[in-house]
Amino acid sequence: MTKHIFALALAAAAATANAQDAPFGTEADAAYAADLWSVMEELRMVGAGMIHAIPYEGIEPHGLMLETFFTEGTVDGHTGTLIVKRNYGPAGVSADEVQAAPEEHLGSITVMFRREQGYDADNQDWFWVKYLPDGTLDQNPAGMQLAGRVAKGADAGCIACHSGSDNYLFTNAAITP
């Protein structure tokens, strides 16, 4: 019995340490992502009445048809670059189909927001989020919410892929590191 209690206590301590060390998906990340969603609603980047652009062809892991917006947003008193990418599908969907019924084809919304200096200096202070169309956070297969320093230090994922560009963007050279 004592061995089982010790094992459970050890497992709980390890889980707590891992949760505290997680580079993304924390309660603080989720709260910040919720604040960011509210800002994007005010800017009409998401939600009812969101503005639209002409969709263009994309590639995985984003949608096969995309809309991308570059603007600024202010979260908790900090104003930073805000990039909102709407990811549409399924494979074979056309720009005309997306324009006719965007809500039927929207799979997710991926966002990069440049936070305050020092947030993540290794990765130009970008905050990464993947939302479902209703504003809830998407999760990876392990159940971690995709908000914060998503996949920091991993061989694949948001940061690993985007670090292949000097400014972490593949669509706009006007935003400097």
Stretches found by the model and what they are:
Residues 1-6:
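Bacterial N-terminal signal peptides that target proteins for export
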Residues 11, 37, 61, 133-136:
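Short linear sequence elements within intrinsically disordered, low-complexity coil regions
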Residues 21-25, 29, 33, 79-177:
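Sequence context surrounding c-type heme c attachment/ligation sites in exported
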Residues 9-18:
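Hydrophobic h-region of N-terminal signal peptides that target proteins for export
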Residues 20-92:
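N-terminal secretory signal peptides
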Residues 9, 70-73, 97:
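Intrinsically disordered, low-complexity serine/threonine-rich segments
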